[in-house]
Amino acid sequence: MTEISSMVISHKKAKVEEMESAWHGDLDGLLRNLYKHEYVYECVVLKTCNRVEIYVVSPKSSSVLFSFAKEMGASTHIIDFYGHDESLEHLLRLAGGLESMIVGEDQILGQIKDLYAYSKKAGTTGKILETAFEKAIQVGKRIRNETRINKGSVSIGSAAVDLAEDIFGGLTGKNVLVIGAGEIGVLVAKALAEKDIEAIYIANRTYKKAEEIAYELGGHAVRLDDIRDYLPGADVVISGTGAPHYILTREIVEEAIKCRERKLLLIDIANPRDIEESVVELENVELCNIDNLRVISERTLRMRKEEAKKAEAIIQEEIRLLNLQYKRQKADRLISELYKQVYDVRLRERQKAVNRLSSYHTIGDIETEVLDDLTRSIVNKILGEPTKVLRQAAELGNEEFLDVVSRVFCLDKEKVRFEKIKQAKFDQIKPGCTKEQAEVKEEYAVKD
């Protein structure tokens, strides 16, 4: 049976710059590059500021994933390669927030939904990955409903605000500039709105979106081109855009601090980074990035240890159900192919009988219907008991028995079946993307 395999590059092993360099194309390019491979039958890509993950269904998963890792130029010491069972457990843990830098954060579940939907619209998913991802999304919701794992600092955005509070000893009376009004920027702004700060300024490439968020949270909208005018008055700048270049260069920051003596804290939560690293050499400027949020992550992990145990128990329960679902799917596929094979014989033999009878006398609709009902009933009665046995064998995990049945009846010609499905989908994939895909691409942009 062809199963799921995955390769994962995440904050656990990779530094910010290593994740940045993991892939330089767009999501369309990466998906098409994966899917055109002869031995990739299904694929999904998850790309966020903290991870690049590739899930494939392939009979030669190891060689396929190693070749993609080589193509991406990623060092194997920062990559985790997972087989089927490990991939399923990792995906469910990811959706539940257990693999996040901030354990229990909610943002990752939305990202999985969006990026899975993107791959599905692109036509690169099939029954195997769809089953896994739909289960993961369901489990992510269940964990958040049945535990308190998402209470407290539950996102990169709120962790950035907590980090700023730690550094300043509180944000009372501070002016904060948020650059970027995507999902992370909104989370930052919402976390800031709960603090006793002097003012929130929200800058974005699309000014209308900045206005909407500023209006909702009682802040001030800023055009992205005007941020130079607001930097001198800011105490904290938190930047998380999808830009392919630096938003704040050393030159811009140096100009902003000329006429001030107080500290300027810059927190860069973008991938690729928004702020040029050399700003740390400037006096009264402190730069933090995603790596610094590990401090907050460790603190949150201690707070949520008991809730994480409950989440782990849910995941193990759901893994068992998911594996049972896959076993049933295999049995159902064999049963479907067996019925199709026998029904093809039924139709041929029924037609032969009709032709023979027609040679003696005229056959009416009633006679044809009787022959049709008779042959169908015979097939269903003969296959009824084997169908039950196949389903029971699948639920008991008797793979050997299923394989024997498959070989005896020449069923489940997997490679041919997958290739036909894949070709039909690939023929439908057109250049460009839908409006919904374009929105996902902008939110999880992978820069050139």
Swiss-Prot record:
The active site is at residue 49. One of its GO terms (molecular function) is NADP binding. CDD domains: NAD_bind_Glutamyl_tRNA_reduct (cd05213). It is an enzyme of class 1 (oxidoreductase). The keyword Cytoplasm does not apply. NADP(+) binds at residues 180-185. GO terms for biological process: protoporphyrinogen IX biosynthetic process from glutamate. Pathway: Porphyrin-containing compound metabolism; protoporphyrin-IX biosynthesis; 5-aminolevulinate from L-glutamyl-tRNA(Glu): step 1/2. Pfam families: GlutR_dimer (PF00745), GlutR_N (PF05201), Shikimate_DH (PF01488). The record marks 90 as: Important for activity. Substrate binds at residues 48-51, 100, 105-107, 111. It comes from the Archaea. Gene3D superfamilies: Glutamyl-tRNA reductase, N-terminal domain, NAD(P)-binding Rossmann-like Domain. Signal peptide: none annotated. Its EC number is 1.2.1.70. Keywords: NADP, Oxidoreductase, Porphyrin biosynthesis. It catalyses: (S)-4-amino-5-oxopentanoate + tRNA(Glu) + NADP(+) = L-glutamyl-tRNA(Glu) + NADPH + H(+). InterPro entries: 4pyrrol_synth_GluRdtase, 4pyrrol_synth_GluRdtase_dimer, 4pyrrol_synth_GluRdtase_N, GluRdtase_CS, GluRdtase_dimer_dom_sf, GluRdtase_N_sf, NAD(P)-bd_dom_sf, Shikm_DH/Glu-tRNA_Rdtase. Homodimer. During catalysis, the active site Cys acts as a nucleophile attacking the alpha-carbonyl group of tRNA-bound glutamate with the formation of a thioester intermediate between enzyme and glutamate, and the concomitant release of tRNA(Glu). The thioester intermediate is finally reduced by direct hydride transfer from NADPH, to form the product GSA. NCBIfam families: hemA. Belongs to the glutamyl-tRNA reductase family. Catalyzes the NADPH-dependent reduction of glutamyl-tRNA(Glu) to glutamate 1-semialdehyde (GSA). Possesses an unusual extended V-shaped dimeric structure with each monomer consisting of three distinct domains arranged along a curved 'spinal' alpha-helix. The N-terminal catalytic domain specifically recognizes the glutamate moiety of the substrate. The second domain is the NADPH-binding domain, and the third C-terminal domain is responsible for dimerization. This is Glutamyl-tRNA reductase. The lineage of its organism: Archaea, Methanobacteriati, Methanobacteriota, Stenosarchaea group, Methanomicrobia. The gene is hemA.
